[in-house]
Amino acid sequence: MLLIKELPTMKKILFSLVVLAAMMTGVRPVQACTSVIVSGHVTKDGRPLIFKNRDTSTLHNLTIVVQGSRYRYIGLVNAEDTTPINVWGGHNEAGFGIINTAAYNLNGDGGDTDGDGILIRKALELCATLEDFERLLDTMNKPREVNSNFAVLDAQGGCAYYETGNYDYVKFDVNDPNVAPEGYLMRTNFGTTGNHKLDQGVERYCAITDFMAEACKEGNLEHDYLITSISRYLKHGVTKLDMYDFMPESENDTQYFPFGDYIARYSTASVILVQGVRPDESPLNTVSWTIIGWPLTTVAIPLVLTSSGKLPAIVTDDGTGHSWLNEKGLKLKQRIFSLEAGNTTSYGDLSQLFNKQGTGILQQIQPVEGEVIARGEEAIAQLRKNSKNIKTIESYYDWVDAYLKKHYRALF
């Protein structure tokens, strides 16, 4: 067990502050997501990106394909809501993608609303462009029952945040250098146009600011890096304490650490990154890169709309009302969050996540994930060359199902 006296003086002070803050902080909003948008002007392939690390009390997530009133779409949903009423991110056949983070300061009362997931579903059903989304916002009955930073992209290269409350919204165009000088923007749980006395998620905003500055400096504003790295960034935004600096000797060297104010927390349920298309490409080449489950125990899989509506079986309802991959990830997560008394439930055992012997859960799934991503990139490249290569995607989905079941069973 990690002892405070074993730490260097400054690290000991900072560690104590993090633990004290974790113990004293009141109830945090559970809908506490972290997001990023990136202009196609700064990605190497010219395709825009929108990313969301989803926090929620509903930890059972999965993906679905739905024929909406106008467009068919891939959606990230709660496992019990596959009809669905609410969708929490995805893209449609017109190349329109959308995600959100709750912004608790936009309506002036600091409260939450019930319409954010409904609006995402309607947008996926009806919208092809940013202008369509703006018309949807303009024509909604008011109050809209929303308080979100909606991130939207389209097949024409459009990409923007919309800080949206019950009566107003403000657009932040990531393609405008006056708005986004480095070609990217970030949001957590406050709007920049809201009442800053009600801001939430400031510590995660500091963390994602640090992460993106470094990614930009290193030329890593790319889909594969962001989907595999943001939710595994374990450096505190305020104290700068990095969990990797507390690397346990082995999986038996139990070291509990408070996860409450990090990007990935106990309440993180899934991750989605929508990779748009260039204006000269088919909207059907839009990709939703998803991590269904806790992102430190599950892996990223690219999802593309097919004519059959097929997706990998392990990220859809497996007949039990849950996703196979999500459930595997939750079981592994229990090994990390093994404490059950009071506020200790937010403390994770780092030795189960990573250690100097390389036997941590995250360390074991990363090579597996690397192969899933590499094979996925190959299949998507074939689709981009010829839209008739959709069978390549479906074959890839079959391979993913078999490959991940084999390796999760062998490893764990």
Q: How does the language model describe each region?
A:
Residues 34-84, 89-90, 96, 100-122, ...:
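C-terminal, well-structured catalytic/ligand-binding subdomain of enzymes
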Residues 11-12, 52:
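A general lysine-centric signal
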Residues 1-9:
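Short, Lys/Arg-enriched N-terminal segments with co-localized hydrophobic residues
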Residues 22-30:
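C-terminal segment of classical bacterial N-terminal signal peptides
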Residues 151:
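An amphipathic, aromatic/His-enriched active-site/gating alpha helix that lines ligand/cofactor pockets
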Residues 117-148:
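Intrinsically disordered, low-complexity linker/loop segments enriched in Gly/Pro
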